[in-house]
Regions:
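Secretory-pathway ectodomains
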Residues: 18-125
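Sec-dependent N-terminal signal peptides
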Residues: 4-13
Length: 125
C-alpha cells in the first residue's frame, strides 16, 4: 500500500511538468555591426534587446522593446511573448516578436517605435 501511495504522490508532483504549456522560445540569431553584437534576451516576460561587445561579450546596454501584460488569473508562461527575429537596417535594429509585431530600435538614441513588418526577420530554423 505504501508503494502505491508513493507512486501516486510522485505522479501528482510530476504531472504539471509532463505536458508543456507552450512550445520553447524561438532561437534568435544575434547580429553584429561595428564591434557590437545585438541579441534578444531570453526573458519572455518583456522583450529586451542586449548590446554587448563583440570581442569580450560584456554587456554594454539593454533596452526594453515592449512590455507583456500578464493576466494574474492565467498561467504566466503561456502569456509570455518572445522576440523571434532581429535584423540590422542602417543605424537601426528591426525586431519581430512571436505575436508578429515589429519594432524599430534607433541604435544611437536607443528609442523604440512600432514598425510595419514588410519582410521576414532572420529566424534560426
Amino acid at each position: 500500500m505504501k508503494k502505491y501511495f508513493v507512486l501516486l504522490a510522485l505522479m501528482v508532483v510530476a504531472w504539471p511538468g509532463i505536458f508543456a504549456k507552450r512550445i520553447p522560445p524561438p532561437k534568435v540569431i544575434s547580429v553584429t555591426q561595428a564591434g557590437i553584437t545585438y541579441s534578444a534576451a531570453g526573458d519572455g516576460r518583456s522583450g529586451y534587446v542586449i548590446a554587448s561587445d563583440a570581442k569580450t561579450g560584456s554587456e554594454l546596454w539593454r533596452v526594453k522593446i515592449y512590455h507583456v501584460h500578464v493576466n494574474p488569473f492565467m498561467e504566466e508562461d503561456v502569456q509570455w511573448i518572445y522576440i523571434s527575429g532581429l535584423k540590422l537596417s542602417g543605424n537601426a535594429l528591426l525586431i519581430r516578436n512571436e505575436a508578429a509585431r515589429c519594432y524599430r530600435l534607433d541604435l544611437e538614441k536607443k528609442s523604440v517605435r512600432n514598425y510595419r513588418c514588410t519582410e521576414e526577420l532572420s529566424i534560426k530554423p
